[in-house]
Amino acid sequence: MGGGSSNAAAVLVGLAKAWGLAADDERVADVARSLGADVAFFLHGGCALLGGVGEVLQRRLETSRRSVVLVKPAEGVCTAEAYKRFDAAPRPVPQDVLVCDLAATRADDVVLANNLAPAAEALLPELPSIREWLAEQAGSESVLLSGSGSATFALVDTFAGASRIATAATAHGWWARPTSLSGLRAAVVPGR
């Protein structure tokens, strides 16, 4: 879930500091955009409404206090293949979802959608099974594949609920972790 992109953003924040630039300097943002839309997102962090291809911060949203459970199969999805499949048969996000999300001021008001999910799920048939299983778990809401996969997540009202679901998922042989949402962004942490 953004591992390489968040690492790239962290390196850029460190370089900006070494160069005497603010992390939100437009030159740093330009480099981030050249590396990928989600790299630019990690410079902002938190919950936000983004424009363009995901690199332009429109506004920040109040972060949800709900917990999250992440579930992944043993295999991964090739991001390039998922985008190739998507490009062959693109699926726009429904208009009503976009209208709702544009009006949102809190992350809890956003209708979650991932129009890349069908392409990724076609490449790894286990993903729909995980999504369906997660949707059946008590307390899970807004079950969705993250980006091109292979992590599927569900929002859960409590950390205890997310932990319970994660434990049940590992019994199925999947990697799973409970976590929470954060308003943090990539930052330089001083050494000891």
Language-model features and meaning:
Residues 1-2, 34, 43, 50-52, ...:
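Short glycine/serine/threonine-biased micro-segments
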Residues 1-25:
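DPxDG-like acidic metal-binding loop motif
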Residues 146-157:
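N-terminal pre-core extensions flanking Radical SAM catalytic domains
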Residues 13, 29-30, 132, 167:
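Active-site phosphate/pyrophosphate- and oxyanion-stabilizing loops and adjacent acidic/basic residues
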Residues 24-34, 163-166:
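Short, well-structured alpha-helical segments that form the helix of a local strand-helix-strand
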